[in-house]
Amino acid sequence: MTIYLPELEQEHDASFPDIESALHDPDGLLAMGGDLTPKRLLLAYSHGIFPWYSNDDPILWWSPSIRGVFIPENYTPSKSLKKFFKKSGYSITINHATSDVISLCASTRPAEETWIMPEMIEAYQNLAKLGHCHSVEVWFNNELVGGLYGLQIGQVFCGESMFSIKTNASKIALWKFCEHFVAFGGKLIDCQMMNPHLESLGAIPMERPIFNERLQVFSAISVFENCYQPQSLSNG
């Protein structure tokens, strides 16, 4: 089957097609090409668009009809996770090792399963240097054993990926970030594509028009000052 996709130009024009023009099959595929400059990435995320592609593909841009999201104020960890954390010896930080978290999200996956290409790693590390990309780290005996990273768009956190080297590390990173994010005025965590794993963690599906309506409202309001300052959250 032949499909038509708008092809984005590099550098000169960072605009995107209307998200309602995204394909139904594959669901949410909107455009191809362009680049991963900070300007384009920030524009994309502010309109509910994100890059997702494999090694042999051009850059592909998506806005799925059903979005996976966490409502952080409604997030409730399981009793078993709470019990585990108390005895875990884990410590949780924000923005202590963003570059390492991004790299580990790529390297801890089998090569054929990761979409985090070297150019993606570089792009998000550049966004971190500019203050737009942030991470949550889980440490055990001073070793980085889990975490997550994503982009800040006002009161929305656009989660990109997470990793876990030791038991429950990524689940605890998510839990502790939800608590922190709510305390600083955060409203929504975007998980992009809904899948069974995210659903098992508490993500819910949200239709594209509703997601983008909330994105436009929440992205216009900043979280409280110091939300993303490097800091410690809690210790197990």
UniProtKB/Swiss-Prot annotation:
Its EC number is 2.3.2.6. One of its GO terms (molecular function) is leucyl-tRNA--protein transferase activity. Keywords: Acyltransferase, Cytoplasm, Transferase. The keyword Acyltransferase applies. InterPro entries: Acyl_CoA_acyltransferase, Leu/Phe-tRNA_Trfase, Leu/Phe-tRNA_Trfase_C, Leu/Phe-tRNA_Trfase_N. PANTHER family: LEUCYL/PHENYLALANYL-TRNA--PROTEIN TRANSFERASE (PTHR30098), LEUCYL_PHENYLALANYL-TRNA--PROTEIN TRANSFERASE (PTHR30098:SF2). HAMAP family: Leu_Phe_trans. Belongs to the L/F-transferase family. This is Leucyl/phenylalanyl-tRNA--protein transferase. It comes from Aliivibrio salmonicida (strain LFI1238) (Vibrio salmonicida (strain LFI1238)).
